[in-house]
Swiss-Prot record:
This is Small ribosomal subunit protein bS6. CDD domains: bS6. It holds the Pfam family Ribosomal_S6. One of its GO terms (biological process) is translation. GO terms for molecular function: small ribosomal subunit rRNA binding; structural constituent of ribosome. The gene is rpsF. It comes from Caulobacter vibrioides (strain NA1000 / CB15N) (Caulobacter crescentus). Residues 104-126 are annotated as: Disordered. SUPFAM superfamilies: Ribosomal protein S6 (SSF54995).
């Protein structure tokens, strides 16, 4: 079996729960066809660089897949039929990266020190 990374962009007017349900449908489809999903990351509602089918935002998801090629082809066929999906891209990779993607790692910047609030206004008045 081969390793794939798959990104899906769903319409902005569906709820986050519906976007998660779409991910679960994809997981079930891959597992029915003899594959395995190693990681699912929901990136949330993000701005699109340009409008796609009159949408300015989309629900982004990343899936790390270990599956045979026919399973991936069937998943892509199902996504072409689904009206909630704006775009998707599947890339074959040498090995699966199970760590947080850079998109989510950038959000989790809890290691940054807290800035004092009194310094904020002092620079503007000077």
């Amino acid at each position: 079996m081969a390793f794939y990374e798959h990104v899906v962009i769903a319409r902005q007017d569906i709820s986050p729960q519906q976007a998660e349900a779409l991910n679960e449908q994809l997981k079930a489809l891959i597992e029915e066809n003899g594959g395995h999903i190693a990681k699912i990351e929901y990136w949330g509602l993000r701005n699109l660089t340009y409008r796609i089918k009159k949408n300015r935002k989309g629900h982004y998801s990343l899936l790390a897949i270990d599956a045979p090629a026919p399973a991936v082809k069937e998943m892509e066929r199902q996504l072409l039929i689904n009206e909630d999906v704006l775009r998707f891209m599947t890339i074959r990779v040498e090995e699966l990266d199970l760590e947080l993607s850079p998109v989510l790692a950038r959000r989790d910047r809890g290691d940054r020190p807290e800035r004092p609030r009194e310094d904020f206004g002092a620079q503007a008045q000077a």
